């Protein structure tokens, strides 16, 4: 991106003028941001993201951040000699793995991001879905077709869960005190078992419960692409379902779009899939006329 020192004062004024109506639109609204992908491993990008979150809070927006951590979990498991298997895009999580997942997500990544935001002048609080029984989960189930027998079988994913209930008591208190919640995607069952939850799914459940103005899913790709690999800037739910059916939306993008649809059905006003590797992607989406990424709406 262009360095700020090369922008003329007049251009800087125009940028601020363009941002004003968007700031007014989001005044006192809640924005849930899922921060993930390999951009999390780049310190400069992570710190730029933290500054952007503080800017949102300073402009009377209520940001709630949910972070992932797949690459960092993989690195730690490899260091400890633990081999991971995946099924239907989800990490099969046994008893040994869930301990490492919780350590990396709730301990390392969460507190690092809290530190970056506080360093930038914000007041962030690091939590996971277990805190205050914020997010209850049920065991996730997936089916796969056996390549030899062609019979569909249920896959045991271990301690992988899906959100079942979100209690907003703690989140609403934090937002009311102008604190910035930073959430690791861990949850507990009603029996007290810890579950690893896909970060996109977790963010969608939280955004839906909060009836957020926007859910932003930061990923490693520019957004939803058409068959010629060009960005689709805007999609209705109906069109998104058509693109899944005809194979335009495929692979790992399918569960992301399904999360978007779920969040919209729960009351979120708009969901955007955008590239988290682009510095200030959140600001570009919220405060410019052209935005960035793919907006999905009803």
Swiss-Prot record:
GO cellular component, one term: cytoplasm
Binding positions for substrate per the UniProt entry: 69-70, 91, 196
Keywords: Amino-acid biosynthesis, Arginine biosynthesis, ATP-binding, Cytoplasm, Kinase, Nucleotide-binding, Transferase
The organism's place on the tree of life at top rank: Bacteria
Main location: cytoplasm
GO MF entries: acetylglutamate kinase activity; ATP binding
Chain positions of site Transition state stabilizer: 34, 256
Locations listed in the record: Cytoplasm
Matches recorded under InterPro entries: AceGlu_kinase-like_sf, AcgluKinase_fam, ArgB, Asp/Glu/Uridylate_kinase, NAGK-C
Pfam families to which the protein is assigned, alphabetical: AA_kinase (PF00696)
Catalytic activity: N-acetyl-L-glutamate + ATP = N-acetyl-L-glutamyl 5-phosphate + ADP
CDD domains the UniProt entry points to: AAK_NAGK-C (cd04250)
Function, in words: Catalyzes the ATP-dependent phosphorylation of N-acetyl-L-glutamate.
Family affiliation: Belongs to the acetylglutamate kinase family. ArgB subfamily.
NCBIfam families: argB
Name of this chain's protein: Acetylglutamate kinase
């Amino acid at each position: 991106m262009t360095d700020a020192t090369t922008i003329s004062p007049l251009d800087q004024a125009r940028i601020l003028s363009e941002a004003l109506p968007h700031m007014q639109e989001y005044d006192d609204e809640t924005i849930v941001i899922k921060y993930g992908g390999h951009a999390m491993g780049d310190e400069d990008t992570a710190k730029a993201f933290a500054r952007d979150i503080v800017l949102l809070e300073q402009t009377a927006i209520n940001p709630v951040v949910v972070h992932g951590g797949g690459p960092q979990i993989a690195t730690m498991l490899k260091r400890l000699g633990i081999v991971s298997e995946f099924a239907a895009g989800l990490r099969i999580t046994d008893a040994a793995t869930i301990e490492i997942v919780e350590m990396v997500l709730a301990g390392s990544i969460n507190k690092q991001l809290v530190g970056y935001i506080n360093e930038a002048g914000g007041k962030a609080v690091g939590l996971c879905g277990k805190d205050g029984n914020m997010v209850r989960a049920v065991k996730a189930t997936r089916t796969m077709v056996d390549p030899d027998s062609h019979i569909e079988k249920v896959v045991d994913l271990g301690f992988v869960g899906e959100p079942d209930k979100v209690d907003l008591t703690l989140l609403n208190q934090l937002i009311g005190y102008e604190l910035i919640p930073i959430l690791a995607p861990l949850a507990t069952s009603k029996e007290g078992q810890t579950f690893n939850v896909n970060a996109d799914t977790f963010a969608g459940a939280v955004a839906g419960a909060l009836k957020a103005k926007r859910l932003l899913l930061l990923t490693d790709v520019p957004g939803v692409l058409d068959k010629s690999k060009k960005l689709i800037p805007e999609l209705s739910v109906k069109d998104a379902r058509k693109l899944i059916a005809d194979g335009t939306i495929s692979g790992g993008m399918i569960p992301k779009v399904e999360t978007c649809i779920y969040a919209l059905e729960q009351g979120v006003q708009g969901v955007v899939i955008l590239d988290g590797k682009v510095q200030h992607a959140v600001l570009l989406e919220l405060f410019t006329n052209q935005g960035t990424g793919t907006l999905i709406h009803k």
